[in-house]
UniProtKB/Swiss-Prot annotation:
Descriptive protein name: Tax1-binding protein 1 homolog B
Zn-finger region bounds: UBZ1-type: 762-788, 789-815
Protein residues bound to Zn(2+) 2: C792, C795, H811, H815
Amino acid composition bias (Basic and acidic residues), ranges on this chain: 356-368
Gene Ontology terms describing biological process: apoptotic process
Organism: Danio rerio
CDD domains: Zn-C2H2_TAX1BP1_rpt1, Zn-C2H2_TAX1BP1_rpt2
Length: 823
């Protein structure tokens, strides 16, 4: 009750007036936990029923309409009139109601809107406790002295179950007895019918005895005929057995031949697998040889190009050394002349600005001489290195040629091996065709034997059926003879009782023993024939299996032939691919040669353009020197006409401002002599005379910071990382000397001037710490730095000298993966 008060207090927030719209009738205080629960309620006139209204069981203390335990839809009343009260009921099944948990529950009516419009008094679900009148004491059935207290209802239920079990057993026994009675009645009727049949048969037998007596003699004659036929059939059976033995021997012979064929096919398969493996190995070796040959050809091409480049560099350096030697001799002679002039000037005149200029020129000449000597030493060292590199390149080229020859020999051997394998494939093909023909003939022989076996089997079955028919006829005749003899014995017996004894006796006792022996003989013959027929069936099964195996071997041989054909086609395709690759290789070689020729033409064009520019430069220098000479002549004319005693004669004529200090022999210089106004390089230059091409006098030698001393062709190679493009030296000129035109505008093809400036910074190799003079030829400096690296001939990527040679070769080969390795 306290729980009910708490539930009502918890639901005080809702409208209490709504709970009276539905009134629950006859609500008990408790109900059985698993029993059907019927709920009666009355819908007052204050509520309008709806099909979605429902009645639920709520635990006391609920707060919302969702706290239900279970619910049922409220049935909609028929012929409902608004404003009237109506009684309805719902039944909760036992498996939906709560268990005996000691809680209080109540019915609630919930509308389709979720409003609770009625609630019942609380109740519980609990089992009924029995009273003293319903209890009963009884002894234990186990024979002990224990008294068991139970309810009368359970006791009566137990007794009822026992009685029903006994009733069921009695009914089953009754059914069994009724079935036995019906069976006995049926047996009685059957025996009566058999008795009537026996009576009729005995009468019929009496009638038949007379007929049997008449036919006994004819049966005896037929028996003799049957014996004769049996002997003939036995002889025929022996003949069939001999034929079957012969057929069996032929089958065994064919089995041995089939085993031999299987062994031969296995050997051929093994040979085929070995040849396939050998062919695969040859293909792999061939691919490796191709790759190696391609690599060697690439190396050969690269080394040939390097060798040509080194040869050209060697020639250039030799020419440069010869030029420098000539220039050195020329400079020495110029210095001697200058020294003579200087002594004469010192002897004839006082020190003035001209002597200072001459001293400055002398100092510059000395510096120029030192730089020239240093450059000559460096060129000698480079020439020595280039000759060593050329020797190494020649040795490497010879080695590569030897390896190429060995590779060609290996390729020829591989081709010979491929031809040998093709010949073996042809031989295997012909052998498989011969085996297929042999197998076809074997199949025909097996089919012929199978037909013979089928014929023999049919004849054997016909003979067995004939013997079975004759055996049945003999049995019938023997039974008739036995019955006839029994009837004769009955007639001879003195009484009917004595005659009944022989009739009831078995026919074997009256027979003389010949029927039983004949039955045994026939049984033995039939068993033997059945065994022989079973053996024949087994042999036929064996022949069928052999035929199936032969067909399988034929299929395998055809598959092997197809595989050999496919391998031959693949080999031909591989040979075609090799030919196409060879053609591609030849095309690539032609393309490389054309590229090299084109590069040579471009180099020749560049040399020609350089030669033209050098000529133009020399012309400009000659014009400049002429203007300088004119100015000096004007200055000399303005001086005192006082005669000066010269210690040495004047080497220059007064009317010719451009004579040579030293008789000069024209030399074939590749890049021109920077100290001479003309440089005859070939026979075509001989048409220009000294009058047409004036030479510069030695009074105005080019300073180290003014013009180009020596120009070398620059290689079009990428610079190493960390090296910056050096700034071109700014030529400075003295105020008292005339300004000479810059030749850089004529050298815009990647060449850098090599000149030594005393005030400039020296160049230092970042790898070997070798010091180079300032404004050393940038291309040579880059060449020296790049000599510390391995350069890829395809992409110009740089690698350290100590890097793995295999990695370097692998990188070079990656440029040829698309057309060499993927075939």
């Amino acid at each position: 009750m306290a729980l009910f008060l708490e539930g009502t207090a918890a639901s005080s927030a809702m409208e209490t007036s709504n709970f009276a719209h539905v009134i629950f009738q006859n609500v008990g205080k408790s109900y059985l936990p698993h029993g059907a629960l019927e709920c009666h309620y009355t819908l007052t006139q204050f509520i309008k029923p709806h099909p979605k209204d429902w009645v639920g069981i709520f635990k006391v203390g609920w707060s919302t309409a969702r706290d239900y335990y279970t619910f049922l839809w409220s049935p909609l009343p028929d012929n409902y009139t608004e404003g009237t009260a109506i009684n309805r009921s719902v039944v909760f099944q036992g498996y939906y109601v709560p268990n005996d948990d000691g809680e209080f529950y109540q019915f609630c009516y919930v509308t389709h809107k979720g409003e609770i419009r009625g609630a019942s008094t609380p109740f519980q679900f609990r089992a009924n406790s029995p009273t003293e009148e319903e209890l009963l004491t009884m002894e234990d059935e186990g024979g002990s002295d224990i008294l068991v207290v139970t309810t009368k209802a359970s006791y009566l239920e137990q007794k009822m179950e026992q009685i029903q079990q006994e009733k069921k057993e009695l009914l089953e026994n009754l059914d069994l007895l009724q079935k036995e009675r019906d069976e006995l009645i049926d047996e009685k009727n059957r025996l009566e019918k058999e008795y009537e049949q026996e009576r009729e048969s005995s009468a019929q037998l009496r009638k038949d005895v007379q007929e049997l007596q008449l036919s006994a003699q004819s049966l005896q004659e037929e028996r003799e005929e049957v014996k004769r036929r049996m002997e003939e059939s036995t002889a025929r059976l022996l003949q069939l057995e001999e034929d079957l033995i012969g057929v069996t021997q032929k089958g065994l012979q064919k089995e041995t031949e089939l085993d031999c064929l299987k062994d031969r096919v296995k050997k051929l398969n093994l040979e085929k697998e070995a040849l396939e493996g050998q062919l695969k190995n040859e293909k792999d070796e061939k691919e490796l040889y191709k790759i190696h040959l391609k690599n060697r050809e690439l190396e050969n091409t690269k080394l040939s190009a390097e060798l040509q480049m080194l040869k050209s560099v060697d020639v250039n350096k030799e020419n440069t050394i010869a030029q420098l030697k000539d220039e050195l001799a020329r400079v020495k002679s110029c210095l001697a002349e200058k020294e003579k002039q200087h002594r004469q000037l010192l002897a004839n005149s006082s020190p003035s600005g001209e002597s200072k200029a001459l001293r400055e020129q002398l100092r510059q000449k000395e510096e120029q001489l030192q730089a020239t000597q240093q450059q000559a030493n460096m060129l000698k060292a480079e020439l020595r290195d280039s000759s060593n590199a050329r020797d190494r390149s020649m040795a490497e080229l010879y080695r590569i040629r030897v390896e190429a020859e060995t590779l060609k020999k290996g390729q020829a051997d591989a081709r010979a091996e491929c031809s040998r394998l093709e010949q073996q494939l042809e031989e295997m093909k012909s052998s498989t065709q011969q085996e297929a023909q042999c197998k076809e003939s074997d199949v025909l022989a097996v089919a012929e034997l199978q037909r013979e076996v089928e014929d023999l089997r049919l004849r054997l079955q016909m003979a067995a059926e004939h013997y079975k028919d004759k055996y049945k006829e003999c049995q019938k005749l023997q039974k008739q003879v036995v019955k006839f003899n029994e009837q004769q014995g009955v007639k001879r017996s003195p009484g009917s009782d004595a005659a009944a004894g022989p009739l009831s006796a078995s026919p074997e006792a009256s027979a003389p023993g010949s029927p039983s022996t004949s039955d045994a003989v026939l049984d033995a013959i039939i068993h033997g024939r059945l065994k022989s027929s079973s053996k024949e069936l087994d042999k036929n099964d064996k022949y069928r299996k052999c035929k199936q195996m032969l067909n399988e071997e034929r299929e395998r041989c055809s598959m092997i032939t197809d595989e050999l054909t496919k391998m031959e086609v693949k080999l031909r395709e591989q040979m075609k691919t090799n030919e196409s690759l060879r053609m591609q290789l030849a095309a690539e070689e032609d393309r490389y040669k054309s590229q090299v020729a084109e590069k040579g033409r471009e180099l020749k064009e560049l040399k020609d353009s350089l030669f033209v520019l050098t000529k133009e430069k020399e012309k400009l220098e000659g014009q400049l020197q002429k203007s300088v000479n004119r100015e000096e002549e004007q200055k000399d004319s303005n001086l005192d006409v006082q005669s000066v005693f010269l210690q040495y004669p004047m080497p220059y004529a007064q009317d010719d401002p451009s004579p040579l200090l030293v008789p000069q022999r024209p030399t074939d210089l590749l890049f021109g002599n920077p100290y001479s106004s003309t440089d005859s390089r070939d026979g075509a230059d001989g048409e220009f005379s000294d009058d047409q091409m004036p030479r510069l006098p030695p009074v105005g030698p080019p300073s180290w910071d003014s013009n180009v001393v020596c120009i070398q062709p620059a290689r079009n190679l990428s610079r190493p990382d960390g090296l910056e493009e050096p700034e071109e030296p700014q030529s400075t000129q003295n105020d008292d000397e005339p300004a000479a035109p810059e030749p850089a505008e004529f050298l815009n093809d990647g060449q850098m001037p090599f000149c030594f400036e005393p005030t400039g910074e020296q160049k230092r190799c970042p790898l070997c710490e070798v010091i180079f003079p300032p404004h050393y030829d940038q291309s040579k400096f880059e060449e020296h730095v790049e000599s510390h690296w391995k350069i890829c001939p395809m992409c110009s990527e740089q690698f350290p000298l100590d890097c793995d040679q295999q990695l370097f070769e692998k990188h070079v080969l990656t440029h040829f993966d698309s057309n060499v390795l993927n075939f």
